[in-house]
A protein has these predicted regions:
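Hydrophobic beta-strand-centered segment that forms part of the acyl-chain substrate-binding groove
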Residues: 12-14, 34, 48-94, 111-115
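Generic structural detector for well-ordered beta-strands
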Residues: 20-23, 69, 119
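Short amphipathic
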Residues: 12-25
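Residue-level recognition of specific faces of alpha-helices
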Residues: 20, 42, 64-67
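A conserved, well-ordered hydrophobic junction motif at loop->secondary-structure transitions
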Residues: 28-41
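HotDog/MaoC-like acyl-thioester-processing domains
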Residues: 3-13, 75-76, 87-163
Length: 163
C-alpha cells in the first residue's frame, strides 16, 4: 500500500480540482446533445491537473480511462461542472475520480451526468515511470476511497495480464 498518516505524503484535498465549462453548439450534434468525446477531453484535462498537482516534479500521462459512465444527457447551454480528486496511489500510478454534473442555467437544476475513473502515471524526463508522494488518509472517506481504488487497480492489472 502507498498511503501514509505522516507528513511525507499529500492529502487528496491538496490536489483536488473543479472547473465549469459552458457547452457550445460546436460541442454538440445537430439535436443539441453534447458529444461524449467533448466530455472525455475535459475529464482527461482535469484528471491530468489533479495528477500533476499530486506528482509535483514529474510529468504525468494518461494510462487509461478505466470507467466512463454517461448517466444523463448534456445539452448546448448547460454548464458542465467537473470535480476531480485522487483516490489511490501506487508507486508511480494514480487513480483520479471525476464527477460530472450538468447545470441547466434556465431553470437552475443540476443533475449528476457522469462519473469517470482515470489512471495516470508519473514519468521522469526520460519517459520512465517515477515515484509519486504517498496519500495521507486523514479521514474514513479517504481510507474507503483508497481501499476501493486498490481493489480496482488489482482488477485492472488482472485484466491487463489477460491481454
Amino acid at each position: 500500500m502507498n498511503y501514509s498518516e505522516k507528513k511525507n505524503g499529500k492529502s487528496p484535498d491538496e490536489s483536488k480540482a473543479e472547473t465549469t465549462i459552458i457547452m457550445l453548439p460546436s460541442d454538440a450534434n445537430p439535436k443539441g446533445n453534447v458529444f461524449g468525446g467533448v466530455i472525455l477531453k475535459h475529464v482527461d484535462l482535469i484528471a491530468g491537473l489533479v495528477a500533476k498537482r499530486h506528482a509535483g516534479h514529474a510529468n504525468v500521462v494518461t494510462a487509461s480511462i478505466d470507467k466512463m459512465s454517461f448517466l444523463k444527457p448534456i445539452f448546448i447551454g448547460n454548464a458542465v461542472i467537473l470535480s476531480a480528486r485522487i483516490n489511490y496511489v501506487k508507486r508511480s500510478s494514480m487513480e483520479i475520480e471525476v464527477r460530472i454534473q450538468a447545470e441547466d442555467l434556465d431553470d437552475n437544476t443540476t443533475v449528476h451526468a457522469g462519473t469517470a475513473i482515470v489512471t495516470l502515471v508519473a514519468i521522469d524526463k526520460y519517459g520512465k515511470p517515477t515515484a509519486v508522494p504517498s496519500l495521507i488518509l486523514d479521514n474514513d472517506d479517504n481510507k474507503r476511497r483508497f481501499q476501493e481504488g486498490e481493489t480496482r487497480m488489482k482488477s485492472r492489472l488482472n485484466e491487463t495480464a489477460k491481454i
